[in-house]
């Protein structure tokens, strides 16, 4: 279901000079003898980003998942990029979340970084789901303009591909604008490097405590592996708490 999305994401990473980085041993791939599903993960070093992770779960008609989070360098205070796509084939159900995940909810910060996502929010009204994601506080690490959809095959085949491409383009444009400002000798950030580091670490801690996918991974790949995956790969800063 999500192979074309994965290819598009990796293509953009390669075009931006991304290089593979080491995934913690034993976490790059896992096969479930119980469900027959498999999970593969990639870690990328991309100019302007300190960490970019990608995960693809393939459990056939039962479940398909694509997840990715990009963490900008600490010298850049712009939002993290968050992608969560889930397809439950037996029920023909799509859950999609695409967001620029803000480090803070300050109005000036939102005005500086979210014009591109605001435009997508207007362009794709079918992905403007107002339903709150139950595991998270929408006012923390999620933007008011996230693209969110609970739909079916029509949304998965028609709305989502165009929205995904436009979303990646908008995020790259925001990132490029920040790099251009930095190259001109002016700081693109209003938050200090220490503040960005602290807030990105807090994001990991917050997300690890609430990640709804942890139970899903546990059901497929067991508790021990899934606990390691949560704290060592998905949200590594949560290990220090």
UniProtKB/Swiss-Prot annotation:
EC number: 1.3.7.2
An example Gene Ontology molecular-function term: 15,16-dihydrobiliverdin:ferredoxin oxidoreductase activity
Keyword DNA damage: no
Pfam families hit by this protein: Fe_bilin_red
GO biological process: phytochromobilin biosynthetic process
Protein purpose: Catalyzes the two-electron reduction of biliverdin IX-alpha at the C15 methine bridge.
Protein name: 15,16-dihydrobiliverdin:ferredoxin oxidoreductase
Source organism of this protein record: Synechococcus sp. (strain WH7803)
UniProt gene name: pebA
